[in-house]
Structure formats: structure tokens, C-alpha cells
Amino acid sequence: MKSPWRILVVSPLLLLPLHSSTSRAHDNQPGTIRSDHYTCVGCVLVVSVIEQLAQVHNSTVQASMERLCSYLPEEWVLKTACYMMVHVFGADIIKLFDKDVNADVVCHTLEFCKQEPGQPLCHLYPLPKESWKFTLEKARHIVKQSPIMKYTRSGAGICSLPFLAKICQKIKLAIKNSVPIKDVDSDKYSIFPTLRGYHWRGRDCNDSDKTVYPGRRPDNWDAHRDSNCNGIWGVDPKDGIPYEKKFCEGSQPRGIILLGDSAGAHFHIPPEWLTVSQMSVNSFLNLPTAVTNELDWPQLSGTTGFLDSASKIKENSIYLRLRKRNRCNHRDYQNISKNGASSRNVKSLIESLSRNQLLDHPAIVIYAMIGNDVCNGRKTDPVSAMTTPEQLYANVLKMLEALNSHLPTGSHVILYGLAHGAFLWDTLHSRYHPLGQLNKDVTYTQLYSFLGCLQVSPCPGWMSANETLRALTSERAQQLSETLRKIAASKKFTNFNLFYLDFAFQEVVEEWQKMGGQPWELIEAVDGFHPNEVALLLFADQLWEKVQRQWPDVLGKENPFNPQIEEVFGDQGGH
């Protein structure tokens, strides 16, 4: 992943690293992506928002920049950083807007966007009526004496600005680590929510004792302490039997572990961050959480989500269903997903997995790398950079062997097929992006072209006007899914049973339409690529129903003592 944190700090609104969501983690493609290309995307988005705020509120550009900063929270000095950015860049932006140039011209003039020699000009908006060269020369003349131009030409990077250095470092650490940064006893569980804390895996109930963590078998039936953090401990005074023994023995407790990519982590950029007609202080209340969770929302994901869904649909995550089935499973979840993950680097993710074969309960592991093996940052010939069936076979076998050495006996592993991404273009290409809704000037076709030109597209194979390329990408995805199916049918392992499920997106679309929804409503509005919260919960419902019908043993028994557990322990300490 090529320094995805840099784009996050051009301005606090530049928390739009579309690059971090998918193929940026191809470790065997060094140097193919330049971080300043992400900075260009961020600049164009933020400058567009500033311009639209001035339009909607009939205000000056200076007032709109200050309005944007006023919306941001104080936490992580986001508001302060924003005002400092206005102080540094504001005067030049005002001068340029006075000449009626658009965001593309502003960002090229300030050199956050640069046309590489021999490369096409990358732009989000239609080109000016005058020639681009003439327009850019006029704009550069306006700011040529600006001291800030010396900074942008130095190549020092936004993070060299003193007031942003701390933010940069924190975000960089958050993205780099797949285990909690705040973990006193180093047991891979935390009492802190973000920075890979309990939003990602069950909350620790004693961060000073590494023998206490979610998912372990109870120590002495937890008569004196809650060693597995499921909220069930102590002794029933009526008969002297430990509650854990009385309520959980023989109930087949198990955890849920996801090995996934940005879709599994629930990569999400709220549309209200870019839609000025909806923008307010409330729009950015969740910004600090999003920053420290890598713009992922695992706490609301389809596999390990535990918070109430904002989508207001009745479906729950796999974890919440397992917990409802057996309340002894409380807090036993791990979302080992990462933006950009694929079969090429999944084995390294397993190093952050927490499961002790002797001390812990079995687990259900879902392998769901649904796109990055066919999605990559190459602008030319992306097909040649896709994972081949032979490579996938080798990668997945290595992963399964690693899992076999980690998982307790009685576990289960489900291989999930790749996505059917042609749906994206077919559904979105003519629709307006949130940034284009005010003036009807930015469609998803324009967004896809802009990202593709900069070589930061999450998936150039599917987010492309080239029908042949989309078909080739879908063909390779199908080949890889078939490879996963063959592995599941032919391989056996000592400590787990192995299964395969298709990524049946059409079934989810049909279910959503029965509920009165439209297909485009299942895709993340800002990036135009990821399944959104509704889609993820519908996928969870689909997976649960299929597993329950085909392999009911995977889910374990329903615990008849659930009512008693709730009566004695309430919410079991919450999440």
C-alpha cells in the first residue's frame, strides 16, 4: 500500500483515500502508484466542496472555507488543522476562484495535480472553453509570487507542515497495524475502540492480563473471574455451580473471524461529507472515528458488526446472529480485514489473528477477498496484473495451511467467491455522483475516468467505459471463484471443515428490490465501488440462510439457557 495516509491530511476533508480501499496492497507491484496522485484527488474534491458551499450559501470563498472548518470537530485537532490550511492556501484559492476557474484548474495551478510528461491530462470536470495550456498559464500567473508555491514545488509533502505532523503519524500507524495500537498486555485485544481496537475484535475485559481475552475456553469455569470476557462468570449461590458451566458447557461456543478486504472492513465515506446541501456540524461528528479506523466501519459490517445499523433494515451481522443463537459467544469476533488485501497478502494478515489451538474455542473463518485479485492500479494492461488461477490456488493453500496451524479442532472455514463487478458500470455510469448533484456536472463515468487517468482507481477493470475490459475482468473473477470452489471440494484439513459459497450479488439485488429498493442503492455513493451497509447486511442474511440450510453444524446449537443468561447477566457487559 503506497503511503495512503498522505492524502488524508491535505485538509481534514481529504479523508477520501479511494486508493486505500482496494488494490493498493499488491506488494509485488512496487512503485506503480504515486502518493501525489491521491493528493490530486483530494485537492479536487475539497476545492469542489468549497466552491459549492459558496454557491449554496451565497457567500464568499473565504466564508465558505471558514464554514467548512467550523463543521469539523476539535478532536484530533481537525478543526485547527483546517483553519491552518485555510491560512496557508486560502488566499491563492480566492484569487483563482475570482477568475472563474474550476477545481481542476485550481489544483493544477497549486501543483497538487500535475500532468506527467507523455501522460494524458487528468481532470474531473469538463475542460475549459479556452485551451488548457492557456488557461493554466493565466492561472499560474495569478499566483506566481505566492510563497506557498515554493512549498508545493519543493516536494516536501503536506506532512512536513508542523501542525499536521502528529495527525500524519497517527494515521500512518493506524493503517500500518492490523493489531490494536493500544494493547497493554499484548494479547491482541483492547479496551480502546479504534486504531484496530474493539471495533475490529471483541473488547478486552482486563487489559493488564494477557490470559484474559474473548474467545478462550473458561479458566476454572470462570468461577472467580471472566477469563473469556463473555460476561458470564461467578457461582450460582443456589447450588454452587459456576454460571459458565451451567449455561455454556456443551453449548458448542464458537467465534467468527473474517479474513477480508475493504468490503469486509466496510470501507465507507459518508456522502454528507461531500454533499453541501446536507452539510452541517452533525455531518462530521463521526470523522475522528473514521480517521482512526482507516475509513472503515467494521463495527457496522455484515460479518462482525455489533452496533445498531443506521440503515434501519432488520437484518443483523453474522456475529450478532451467532450471539443470539448462543449468548456464550458474546464478544467472540475478529475482523482481520484490510483495505487492499487479496490472496497475495492474506497470509500476512493471519499473523494478526488471535486463536490458540489448546486454550480457545473453535471458530468460523470466512475468507472473503472479493475483488483485489482482479483489481489493480495499472492503467495499461490491467489484465496482465490480475492474479491467475494458478497463483490463487497456491496463495489460498498457503493460507489454509497457516489456518490449520492456528485454529482449534472443530473449526470451519468458508471460502467466498469473487464479486460480479460489471454491475457497477451498468448501474452507476450515467448517475450523478454526490459531488455532481448540485450542478449536474459530475457523473460516475467522469469519476471513474478521473481516477483511472491518475492510476488510483479501485478497480480499473470494472470501473471502465471499455466493455471488453469489463468482460475480461469478470471472466477472470469467475475463473478465480471456480478455483476456490475446486479447493473447497478437494482439500481436507485436520482442524477445520472447508466450504465454498458464491458471491451471489444478483440474489441480494432481487431481495432488495422486493423490499422496494433500487439496485444503485446497494453501492457506496462516494467511491462508486464498494457494497454499502445495506448490501453487506443482506449478504450476511444470505450467507446465514445458506449455511443454516446446507451445513447447520457450522453454526452450532441454539443455547436453551439464553433466557437465563440474559436474566442473570443482562447485556453481559455490552460491547
Swiss-Prot record:
E.C. code: 3.1.1.77
Propeptide: 26-34
Effect in UniProt of substituting residue 262 to A: Loss of catalytic activity
Keyword Glycoprotein tagged: yes
Glycosylation sites: 58, 206, 466
Name of a matching Pfam family: Lipase_GDSL
Cofactor note: Binds 3 Ca(2+) ions per subunit. The calcium ions probably have a structural role.
Superkingdom to which the source organism belongs: Eukaryota
Subcellular location: Secreted; Cytoplasmic vesicle
Assembly with partners or alone: Heterodimer of the large and small subunits; disulfide-linked.
UniProt-recorded name of the protein: Acyloxyacyl hydrolase
Organism: Oryctolagus cuniculus (Rabbit)
Lineage: Eukaryota, Metazoa, Chordata, Craniata, Vertebrata
Gene: AOAH
